Amino acid sequence: MKIFVDENIPLMTVRALREMGHIVTDIRNTPDKGMADDDVWAMVQREKQLLITTDKGFAQYRNKQHHGILIVRLRKPNRHKIHQRIIKAITQFSEKKWHGILIVMRDTVQGVWRSADRN
């Protein structure tokens, strides 16, 4: 699966996703580091990638057509907790099921929203 990880995702997660066979774009390794959310969104859609972030602002795109959004929102985040929640979500859904899905992973629960525009 093609995945884009925002700057706030642990490097251990990037490595684990690559070891699982995913094609991962890590913005930290590009000249685009620090780009605006709208520009990140446009790039992710152009490249047909699942977006993984801790930035709740990306939830605003949930009703648009997209290739999946995974937002991790924890009360006391640390890289190990963020990593665990991401790996759990990635293994829970197949690549085809991510299309048009927003998942918010919290400490003990997860929320799932399906886009109104899942074309």
Residues of each region from the PLM?
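Metal-dependent nucleic-acid phosphoesterase active-site entry motif
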Residues: 2-10, 106-119
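N-terminal first-folded block
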Residues: 2-49
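Structural signal for conserved beta-strand scaffold positions within catalytic alpha/beta enzyme cores
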Residues: 26, 53, 71-73, 104
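Acidic, metal-binding active-site segment of PIN/NYN-like and related structure-specific nucleases
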Residues: 45-62
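Short, charged/polar surface micro-motifs in flexible loops or helix N-caps
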Residues: 49, 66, 76-77
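Ligand-binding "clamshell"
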Residues: 62-70
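C-terminal structural segments of small proteins and small subunits
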Residues: 74-112
